[in-house]
Amino acid sequence: MSDGGKTKTTVEIYGQSYTIIGQETKMHMRHVASIVDDKMREINEKNPYLDINKLAVLTAVNVVHDYLKLKEQYEKLEIQLKEKE
């Protein structure tokens, strides 16, 4: 459903349904939700005794860590490209 450039979709993350509204496509939002779900399940396999809140926070920390590593790699590549110009 698109309303004023916004898309609404329902996704399932770790057994819970969430309605998400954003400017990206439904496919993109579902892909993001799938990655979050996969990451939560991966962390839960290693730490099965975490409650849902701690699992969610640990997942967020891990995802931001991965994001920052990729951002750093991207910035290094940008510098290398500029040096070659």
UniProtKB/Swiss-Prot annotation:
Main localisation: cytoplasm
Keyword check for tRNA processing: no
GO biological process, one term: FtsZ-dependent cytokinesis
InterPro entries, sorted: Bac_CellDiv_Activator (IPR053712), Cell_div_ZapA-like (IPR007838), Cell_div_ZapA-like_sf (IPR036192), Cell_div_ZapA_firmicutes (IPR023688)
GO cellular component entries: cell division site; cell septum; cytosol; plasma membrane
Name of one Pfam family that matches: ZapA
Keywords on record: Cell cycle, Cell division, Coiled coil, Cytoplasm, Septation
Coiled-coil positions: 60-85
KW Amino-acid biosynthesis (keyword) present: no
Subcellular location(s) of the protein: Cytoplasm
Complex formation: Homodimer. Interacts with FtsZ.
Annotated function: Activator of cell division through the inhibition of FtsZ GTPase activity, therefore promoting FtsZ assembly into bundles of protofilaments necessary for the formation of the division Z ring. It is recruited early at mid-cell but it is not essential for cell division.
HAMAP family attached to this UniProt entry: ZapA_type2
Family assignment from sequence similarity: Belongs to the ZapA family. Type 2 subfamily.
Protein name: Cell division protein ZapA
